[in-house]
A protein has these predicted regions:
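Conformationally flexible catalytic loops at phosphate/diphosphate-handling active centers
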Residues: 1
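Beta-strand/loop-dominated core regions that host nucleotide or nucleotide-derived cofactor-binding catalytic loops
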Residues: 5
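Conserved alpha/beta-domain cores
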Residues: 13-219
Length: 219
């Protein structure tokens, strides 16, 4: 570092005299790369962090294509290998990258609440991920189709959902970022809500344990 080699300017704003608000303003943060920047702004934590952004930006591969990596055709395998360089396995690539993204958000705003919404890709969006076309149905209206909570408890997606749960456990239990909370999207019925809570518990994310809160979007 060479002192005074380049000119630069610093802009600062004082927020010390701002009045207290009668409510808590939480942020929507999607990009972990900006988390520490946004954490410097006045805030009460993160009200919504979408897992889809992390999957799209940091992974880019359909989870089923990774779980069934050995069954993919050679060209697709090579494409996936390029994306997962530095990771021991396709599974670890998915879980590790999710963990990195979630933990970055949790650490940036710690100890404030960070509500992370589990994946809510629509079928056409999952199909756009590398290897995704093979595993997704063609739906008339994906907005109301196979998405959110309904995926988590389906036999065709349950083990993919387990990867998200593993990442969340690493963030909360191994890294100690217990300020990270779970949001379940697109819950359609009470029975579905109950089934997802039970599935989360089977995956090691029990409501109330280690202070875990589970929030749901009922749509």
């Amino acid at each position: 570092v060479y002192a005074e080699l380049l000119d630069f300017s610093v802009k600062s704003s004082s927020v010390g005299d701002m009045p207290d608000l009668p409510l808590k303003v939480m942020m929507n943060v999607g990009n972990p790369d900006r988390a520490f920047d946004f954490a410097c702004l006045p805030n009460e934590g993160v009200g919504l962090a979408r897992l889809e952004f992390i999957i799209n930006r940091m992974i880019g591969v359909h989870p089923r294509a990774l779980l069934e990596f050995d069954d993919q055709e050679p060209g697709l395998q090579n494409e996936i290998r390029e994306l997962m360089k530095g990771y021991d396995s396709p599974r670890e690539f998915y879980v590790g990258r999710l963990t990195e993204g979630i933990a970055t958000l949790g650490a940036a705003f710690y100890p404030k609440r960070v509500i992370v919404r589990l994946s809510d890709f629509k079928s056409n969006e999952y199909a756009n991920l590398v290897g995704g076309e093979r595993y997704e149905p063609e739906e008339e209206n994906p907005m109301l189709g196979f998405r959110g909570a309904g995926r988590y408890v389906s036999e065709s997606f349950r083990d993919c959902f387990a990867l998200e749960c593993e990442a969340m456990k690493r963030v909360r239990n191994d890294m100690g970022l217990t300020n990270v909370e779970v949001m379940v999207p697109f819950v359609r019925t009470v029975a579905q809500a109950k089934a997802v809570v039970e599935e989360l518990e089977r995956q090691g994310l029990k409501r109330g344990e280690n202070g875990l809160k589970i929030i749901m979007m009922c749509e």
